[in-house]
């Protein structure tokens, strides 16, 4: 066998392995989202004041234990979450949207963008006297399919716990 022929054979094998790898990644890839919402008997401005006062999170928030940094589009923040029955995790996302009395949204990535991304949002909608708080996380990227249902369930339970604590804090003022 000549060197050029074995080089072509090796190249063909490598291309085949790469194709199989990409097909597996695509087969395992699945974008996912989790959401929890709650109605709060206070206007959005009252709920916003609590949500935006991130320095007070440790005193009332069972899920987002700490949020450090400025809530301004483009700024990098540090977020420590404590999902129920799990170890705390720290992320450093970039703030995408801040609309007073309406929405906070940030995007975090593990490694490089597109590998494993999480876009988190808090949306406030009003029916006149009450606020509908919608907390949502959209997971996307090549490795999202590796997220276990257990992690998603625990994270959602954390959303619910935070929403309930926020409701209690807002309605008791």
Regions found by a protein language model. Give the residues of each.
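A conserved amphipathic terminal alpha-helix motif
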Residues: 3-12, 132-134, 138-173
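Hydrophobic ligand-binding cavity/cleft-lining segments
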Residues: 2-72
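Short beta-edge strand/loop motif at the mouth of beta-sheet-based domains
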Residues: 55-90, 98-99, 103
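Short glycine/serine/proline-enriched coil/turn segments at secondary-structure junctions
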Residues: 85-87, 112-116
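Hydrophobic pocket/interface hotspot
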Residues: 46-51, 57, 77-79, 95, ...
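Hydrophobic/aromatic beta-strand elements that line small-molecule binding cavities or substrate pockets
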Residues: 36-38, 91-97, 108, 118-126
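A mature extracytoplasmic/lumenal domain signature
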Residues: 63, 81-83, 97-99, 108-110, ...
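A short, structured loop/turn motif at beta-sheet edges
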Residues: 41-44, 72-73, 96-103, 123-132, ...
